[in-house]
Amino acid sequence: MSVLTPLLLRGLTGSARRLPVPRAKIHSLPPEGKLGIMELAVGLTSCFVTFLLPAGWILSHLETYRRPE
């Protein structure tokens, strides 16, 4: 690295340091009521079907995805 590299990098990042960083204003309240058993069951089942079922299908059919040698 040359002697001018730190000066060049400082010149490139100097303008970025002065930019204001936007902050998210997130405010939430506690839930009005507790979740019931049926709501929990529906939520967990939908997560299982959405994420784990396709991954399990791919893993069970992994040999068909391999390239023939």
UniProtKB/Swiss-Prot annotation:
Annotated GO molecular function terms are: cytochrome-c oxidase activity
Q: Which residues lie on this side of the membrane: Mitochondrial intermembrane?
A: 61-69
| Segments on the Mitochondrial matrix face | 26-36
Where the protein is mainly located, per its record? mitochondrion
Transit peptide where, by residue?
Answer: 1-25
Post-translation: what modifications?
Answer: In response to mitochondrial stress, the precursor protein is ubiquitinated by the SIFI complex in the cytoplasm before mitochondrial import, leading to its degradation. Within the SIFI complex, UBR4 initiates ubiquitin chain that are further elongated or branched by KCMF1.
The protein, known as: Cytochrome c oxidase subunit 8A, mitochondrial
